[in-house]
UniProtKB/Swiss-Prot annotation:
Top-level taxon of origin: Eukaryota
Protein name in UniProt: Desmocollin-2
Biological process (GO), any one: regulation of heart rate by cardiac conduction
Cytoplasmic compartment segments: 716-902
Any one GO molecular-function label of the UniProt entry: calcium ion binding
TM segment ranges: 695-715
Cellular component terms per the entry's GO annotation: adherens junction; cytoplasmic vesicle; desmosome; endoplasmic reticulum; intercalated disc; plasma membrane
Amino acid sequence: MAAVGSMRSGSPAFGLGHLLTLAILALASDACKEVVLQVPSELPAEKFVGRVNLMDCLKSADIVHLSDPDFQVLEDGSVYTTSSVVLSSGQRSFTIWLFSTDSQEEREISVHLEGPVEVLNKRPHTEKVLSRAKRRWAPIPCSMLENSLGPFPLFLQQIQSDTAQNYTIYYSIRGPGVDKEPLNLFYVERDTGNLYCTGRVDREQYESFELTAFATTPDGYTPEYPLPLLIKIEDENDNYPIFTQKLYSFTVQENSRIGSIVGEVCATDLDEPDTMHTRLRYSILEQSPSPPMLFTMHPSTGVITTTSAQLDRELIDKYQLLIKVQDMDGQYFGLHTTAKCIITIEDVNDNLPTFTRTTYVTSVEENTVNVEILRLTVQDKDLVNSPNWRANYTILKGNENGNFKIVTDPKTNEGILCVIKPLDYEERQQVTLQIGVVNEAPYTREASSKSPMSTATVTVTVTNQDEGPECIPPMQTVRIQENVPVGTRNDGYKAYDPETRSSSGIRYRKLSDPRGWVTVNEDSGSITIFRALDREAETVRNGIYNITVLALDADGRSCTGTLGIILEDVNDNGPFIPKQTVVICKATMSSAEIVAVDLDDPVNGPPFDFSLESSDSEVQRMWRLTRINDTAARLSYQNDPSFGSYAVPIRVTDRLGLSSVTTLNVLVCDCITESDCTLRSGERTGYADVRLGPWAILAILLGIALLFCILFTLVCSVSRASKQQKILPDDLAQQNLIVSNTEAPGDDKVYSTNGLTTQTMGASGQTAFTTMGTGVKSGGQETIEMVKGGQQTLDSRRGAGYHHHTLDPCRGGHVEVDNYRHTYSEWYNFIQPRLGDKVQFCHTDDNQKLAQDYVLTYNYEGKGSAAGSVGCCSDLQEEDGLEFLDHLEPKFRTLAEVCAKR
């Protein structure tokens, strides 16, 4: 019972494990079931047959065998023929064994190949009802090999509905390949449900077709739902892998380590991804130049790496590789293409520059500068005109004085040795230089360990030159005491012949002497005092007076030197107070500090002694001096002085007793600071001497002169204005605008044509108006007689727009005023002949027209009668017009417009 109970209690777990095992076995058996492949009756070698699912059957399988040697299976389950196969009986079968060494499991898959079966389009006629197994109206797996050779139409499969047992069913399909692009590629027999393909299909264009199958009765009834039907196009290895570039270019440095990456190539395949058809393998077919092979390519990634560290650009600077890519994981029957790859070896500085010669000999003349004396050549195997090839030269030894310089010729890479500082034959006849050379780019570690820097020795011979005198040292000095007597001789400048080291035959000449104090002896170069020497002069700096001397030899060669005359000081300058005016602000201070200076050397200067230099007892009583230090003293007042200016004489004496008196102007002010100093008015100025300076006097005189000029200008202006008043009487019609456009009849009075108003001016300036006789006024001219012979003439001619006034004063003065542009002579020449003609015509006609010799009254002017003029002198036939009125000045044109408006 216990055993039974035990078995019963464990039976549920045992049953669950048993069911799980059965499920796994069922799935495995379903994955390892028989596979039926539709193939042509003839298969060529290396032809793709189909694909079986190896991973689902036995995932850990590592050994695969086939029972038929005419076929082979790849890792992804693709089945290929190894030789030509003919299905003589229309079918062929073989078995694939799978074995896992880890789990010791074994599986097998049966593969059946079926050739094309000719299916009659005519539905078979049977008189009995066929019994068949029940079918489900469900999706049926269907596939088709791309690029199938047929024969077409190619039978794919048959679709049937379970309702065919009860109804007469018609089958139809729709979708891409039927009623959509590509049209009419598939069709189904209406009665049998057989599905056919009418032509070849390219998987790269159409990976699959999703069709919909329909089952209907003749009367249109649909007993089944539409059936989704997927037709998958099995891929065929019909596309070659293609490199992304036809020519690849890579660079790699020479002497690179093994395994250095050169570059990576890439190829693409249009076949179905993740299959053997697109599993690519890369390889190098050929290397040029020929082996040894220096490069390798990773078969899966296409990365090119180096296999040797002996890449030398100096031997071979470029390699060409022929590379290949092949699908089917590199199987011999896979498709492949090739491309070219150019690998350029990049230069590194692995070769040191070396001199072609180790010793050089050259020469240079002394005293020459900036000349090329030698070119040094080097050899470098690195890339020309690159930093690895260009040389840098250095003078290692022998150029301690900086006489030489070496530079690189950028074109030839030669070293150019130049002299930049003159050489002296008398000092050195030969110079030995050691020159080294390196590259611009740093050396690689391997190169720098091979050999040290390349060096060369250059021997430079200095040749002698007949040169001029040498002024060495260029600055020479002599010591002379100031104020020595004129004519005193002293040593001067000395130049030497560098070859003889003597001064014979050298002549001297003075080039500069700012104050003309000395003369230079032409033969010896000695100097003679020409004027008194003053150490305190402005041209003396730090007690030294410089002159420039030119030395010449017999051939005219020269040199220039400077002679510094050191002037020894004598006590010839007494101390003095430079600030001669001091301010004492009485409110804030009672003293002022005074400082004395001495132009002599300190040995002849301080300490100074300050004292009041005056016999005036008031100065001694009011002021007091107190010593502050060697050069300063304090001046303070003793009594309460008034605000003002005080002259205080002070004597300053140096240590040797030489003294001078300085009169100090002391300002005692009511101020806070010295800048605010102002003297109080009304206070006594003591005994200060206050004077006006020359500039103050000049300013006062200029002010007075300016005032007189202003007064004189005002008087002249007033006098001229009074003289110009009332030159003409107010009632003269010539100077007034009168109304002249009236045409009313005049009065019955007769006016005398000979009457003329005359203005007479007495000596006292009073003006009287009288009437002059006939002939006084002629042509609009008035004459005004004056008491003392003065005469005033007034011309007023309206016709030409011109007024002219002439005034002759009593005492010979003459004033003339022109108001307009026309001159008097032009108007006179124009009007005088016409006035003469008019006067003559009037005189000749007086006897005949006496009644018209007065103003006439015209009451009526007939229709169309020309407007005439009054008076006997009128002439209707006058030829001269009044066109000049059209060219009046602007002011008269305005007057005419005003009159016209009235």
